[in-house]
């Protein structure tokens, strides 16, 4: 049998033997102490931040409960989902899904990445290669940007600035302005995108598209 096979067989034997032993006793076995933490899914958060959140002591074992560990990771601002699993004999695997940034927004005097909830996250902006718009740190602005990103990604890539104007949202970029209600639906945004494509197909430019009205998009400053 190969060395790897011997190791696997040994682990299996220990686990089977452990069926007759309490988890408390197995926690004291050095073989099952956590020696490595593997982080998966982190794009913006630094892995060391996630590992530190686990607060693992020197005696931490794979037989410790993992639910509490996942809760600690989930508590980090910017983590949407967290799961902690074991890989025998001594590795913890931390898998996270992060909230997706939709804009850059100012927070305490510096620009940070803002998600679609309007939260400015503890993410390093340089870790996102996309060119994101600069936006007001506002939940309604973030929500509309998130919907535009999902429903009309081509329109989203042209947005440079996003702001709240009264009850409405103003998006601008490339010499174009888009007006939307703060509660704009996917259907409203798709209607706006359809007009953008129609005008481009006919070689027409415009200054502003006003999509604040149901089933209507008003074009202002259109070139003939």
Language model feature labels by segment:
Residues 1-38, 45-75, 81-224:
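Charged, solvent-exposed interaction patches on well-folded alpha/beta domains
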